[in-house]
Amino acid sequence: MSEFDLSKIKEFYNRIPEIWAPDDAWHTYSHHELDHYIKQHMNLFEDTRVLNAGSGGNDYGISCKEMYHVDIAEEKVKNCKNYIVSSIEKLPFPDESFDNIICVGSVLNYCDAFQAISELSRVLKKSGKIILEFESSWGYEYLNTKEYKAPVTVITLEYMHEQHTQWLFSPEYIYKILKQYNLKILEQTPFHILDGLLSKILSEELSVKLTQIDHIIKNWPIFRKHGNNIILLLEKSFVP
């Protein structure tokens, strides 16, 4: 996988006042879903050392023994107690440094997935947990496009009135990498299911309002594999 121009990504995120655009219905809903999921799993972090990979300076209200914020955008993390400016593709920590890891906000979609996941696994202790989220090519948003269901592809999208290039991965592509690095899937939670389809005929704002139905249909096999975004709870397996 080729690399994107990290300097452009870094410049953008250093410049914008906040990571989540308040006037963007789609990303506001994404932020809400991620925040809600993490709050449901707060018990994982009690008295643990946590890596917040690609944090943007957001600690999600987590109470833990110690949290390290890693991000390529220094402006977003410089006020955090423990921060390092780095890509998650090359983490400056020894092996098995952390009890748990958070990597959400589609951080993975700006990275070489193999390299990023291998690094997350490397710095995670055995039996440690990762909350990982990524954008999927199986999302209905890409229906009838060449990107739909592609194992790995590049897309250009608009965010905060600017064009951005990022990777898009199929779930199976990511799952194969996870298996290679001994990361077992404990939970899989898709979101942005229905609005990806409705956005083809309705406004984005109305589509997102109707996507509350996701909380029902995400458990139906025919729909759950078509989430535009997928949150995974992972555990690092013990390998003798």
Q: How should these model regions be labeled?
A:
Residues 100-114:
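A short SAM/SAH-binding and catalytic strip from SAM-dependent methyltransferases
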